[in-house]
């Protein structure tokens, strides 16, 4: 089977590490001009800011939905609180119905929030990288500050400043960790 970007068979001695895996030094040998043009178009599309933003927003939405569902399933009402006592007095079916309704609403809320944060940060980082024409740690700090500031802006200037500082620090820490050389 001929898959663009993959070599067939075993890699010869002296080949680059990872040869035979998609995008790992295989190049476009053995592909027709049409296949090469298609691969280049796919790479160009994946590098565009709108596509990166949509992908990050979609992945954030999915992850947020799963996270919200998990967190809602872990929360429980104690029978020692007035709300817990009221729920425990309901019939079993009503308890289950309310539980699923709560799980759905929390899942939807988390999905929206994660999707917005993912799309906003990814889009901002892509634009900053394009404007600076560099791929370094500063892009993450600038993008984190802009994203945190936008997310905190509704709560006032102090919240926007705190969001800027917090999100920038978190983004810098994650990006610095991701850029560390692997121990191979």
Curated annotation (Swiss-Prot):
Gene Ontology annotations of biological process type: protein insertion into mitochondrial inner membrane
Superkingdom: Eukaryota
Presence of keyword Thylakoid: no
GO molecular function, one term: mitochondrion targeting sequence binding
Main location: mitochondrion
Coiled coil feature spans: none
Places the protein is found: Mitochondrion inner membrane
Segments passing through the bilayer: 8-28, 54-74, 150-170
Disulfide bonds: 49-126, 145-164
Topology with respect to the bilayer: Multi-pass membrane protein
Keywords for the protein's UniProt record, in alphabetical order: Disulfide bond, Membrane, Mitochondrion, Mitochondrion inner membrane, Protein transport, Translocation, Transmembrane, Transmembrane helix, Transport
Keyword Chloroplast carried by entry: no
Any one of the GO CC terms: TIM22 mitochondrial import inner membrane insertion complex
InterPro entries the record matches: TIM22
Family the UniProt entry places it in: Belongs to the Tim17/Tim22/Tim23 family.
Function of the molecule: Essential core component of the TIM22 complex, a complex that mediates the import and insertion of multi-pass transmembrane proteins into the mitochondrial inner membrane. In the TIM22 complex, it constitutes the voltage-activated and signal-gated channel. Forms a twin-pore translocase that uses the membrane potential as external driving force in 2 voltage-dependent steps.
Subunit structure of this chain's protein: Component of the TIM22 complex, whose core is composed of TIM22 and TIM54, associated with the 70 kDa heterohexamer composed of TIM9 and TIM10 (or TIM8 and TIM13).
Name this protein carries in UniProt: Mitochondrial import inner membrane translocase subunit tim22
Source organism (scientific name): Aspergillus oryzae (strain ATCC 42149 / RIB 40) (Yellow koji mold)
Protein's gene: tim22
């Amino acid at each position: 089977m001929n898959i663009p970007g993959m070599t067939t068979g075993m890699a010869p001695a002296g080949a680059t590490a990872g040869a035979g895996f998609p995008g790992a030094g295989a190049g476009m040998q053995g592909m027709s001009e049409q296949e090469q043009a298609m691969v280049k178009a796919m790479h160009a599309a994946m590098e565009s800011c709108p596509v990166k933003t949509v992908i990050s927003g979609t992945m954030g939405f999915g992850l947020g939905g799963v996270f919200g569902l998990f967190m809602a399933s872990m929360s429980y009402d104690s029978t020692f609180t007035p709300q817990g006592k009221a729920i425990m007095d309901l019939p079993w079916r009503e308890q289950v119905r309310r539980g699923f309704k709560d799980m759905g609403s929390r899942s939807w809320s988390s999905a929206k929030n994660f999707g917005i944060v993912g799309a906003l940060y990814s889009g901002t980082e892509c634009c900053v990288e394009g404007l600076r024409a560099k791929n370094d740690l500063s892009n993450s700090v600038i993008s984190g500050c802009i994203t945190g500031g936008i997310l905190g802006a509704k709560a006032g200037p102090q919240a926007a400043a705190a969001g800027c500082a917090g999100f920038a620090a978190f983004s810098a820490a994650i990006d610095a960790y991701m850029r560390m050389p692997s121990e191979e």
